[in-house]
């Protein structure tokens, strides 16, 4: 049987899909029911919110609405090293996104699942961002592994 040809393969005899790097080694627990992402506009230029993005999951006590705010590397660095910064714990990061979330425009309605207990691969982060996130005391069950 021949190789399955899909589109223009440029004489390539191998078929690959996906990417080669895993984000999670293991996920054990997540926050119940995903939340609506509140800061989609921060991610338009990137086109997606990658799996493993640090986030703050919250539930409105009055309405029960679940929300998630995802943080960029720049926001994390600013919280730790910016002038008058209050430290990484001030962001309220209590989880990391489970999967990639595609973002088409600032009007995209997106939801995400926040993992609160699991093993995440450290190579998914810049070294300085990983060191800052390891100091976060609001998400102690997510372990950075090599």
PLM region spans:
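Surface-exposed, low-hydrophobicity beta-strand/loop segments enriched in small/polar/acidic residues
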Residues: 1-146
């Amino acid at each position: 049987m021949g190789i399955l040809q899909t589109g223009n393969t440029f004489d390539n005899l191998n078929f690959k899909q996906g990417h080669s790097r895993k984000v999670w080694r293991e996920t054990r627990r997540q926050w119940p029911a995903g939340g609506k992402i509140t800061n989609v506009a921060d991610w338009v230029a990137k086109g997606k919110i990658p799996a493993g993005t640090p986030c703050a999951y919250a539930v409105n006590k009055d309405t029960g609405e679940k929300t998630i705010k995802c943080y960029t590397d720049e926001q994390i660095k600013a919280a730790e090293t910016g002038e008058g910064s209050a430290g990484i714990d001030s962001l309220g990061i209590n989880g990391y996104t489970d999967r990639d979330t595609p973002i088409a425009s600032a009007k995209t309605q997106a939801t995400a699942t926040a993992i609160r207990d699991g093993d995440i691969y450290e190579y998914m982060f810049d070294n300085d961002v990983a060191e800052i996130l390891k100091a976060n005391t609001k998400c102690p069950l997510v372990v950075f592994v090599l």
